[in-house]
From Swiss-Prot:
Pathway: Cofactor biosynthesis; thiamine diphosphate biosynthesis. One of its GO terms (biological process) is thiamine diphosphate biosynthetic process. Gene3D superfamilies: Aldolase class I. GO terms for cellular component: cytoplasm. One of its GO terms (molecular function) is thiazole synthase activity. It is found in: Cytoplasm. This is Thiazole synthase. It catalyses: [ThiS sulfur-carrier protein]-C-terminal-Gly-aminoethanethioate + 2-iminoacetate + 1-deoxy-D-xylulose 5-phosphate = [ThiS sulfur-carrier protein]-C-terminal Gly-Gly + 2-[(2R,5Z)-2-carboxy-4-methylthiazol-5(2H)-ylidene]ethyl phosphate + 2 H2O + H(+). Belongs to the ThiG family. Its EC number is 2.8.1.10. It comes from the Bacteria. Pfam families: ThiG. HAMAP family: ThiG.
Amino acid sequence: MEIVHAIGGGQGDPLVIAGKAYTSRLLVGTGKYKDLAETRAAVEMAGAEIVTVAIRRTNIGQDPGQPSLLDVIPPDRYTILPNTAGCYTVEDAVRTCRLARELLGGHRLVKLEVLGDPTTLFPDVTATLEAAEILVRDGFDVMVYTNDDPIIAKRLEEIGCVAVMPLAAPIGSGLGIRNPYNILTIVENAKVPVLVDAGVGTASDAAVAMELGCDGVLMNTAIAEAKNPVLMASAMKKAIEAGREAFLAGRMPRRRFASASSPLAGLFFD
């Protein structure tokens, strides 16, 4: 068990973001659950350490009279990752990050997303680049949602983002990894963590992302909209771990023709 733990994930194979090490490579969102109790149960079952929160849609102290997500996802147990979901302009995204910093007592780690279209929820990459530059200058540690364009991903890294998060497919679509070679190219060229963000639908999608060499996966809808969210959270945890181990192990080469698994020399009755 100790060997598997060291090689396949955990303390011997940490995910490091903005100088902090995490044992889990599964990051989860908090939207779309039926209630806060289900949110807590799913997050716990996933084994996640980083939990993302939509500041514009979730109460984390903005409304003292209402239940707060932080009551069930306490910041002393989890790293809270405020995100700018629902922002379509640079100004809104930057303002939302600054609000999160105020609400969370100087919190620096944020997930930036600037959307360009309400139908696809694809990122507006021009606005994303501009917002990233502003936030990095303002002292934020920026994890950034982007498309699967390797050139844009590299530019965001050069700006100073601490992690690049390309979509695998449209947010909430569950379509899986649509352009694996684009994701692979981003991974191969990156010097910061690459985490697939959006598009995962089931455990096999998460495993594929990790097998490509991604450092982690962030998901919400795939767990929250499952028939049994808590059970799906467990499945995703195992898929992330299995995919990471497979990547570290190194898959066999693909071959066009068969290759016998048993030696031909020394056959009985030969």
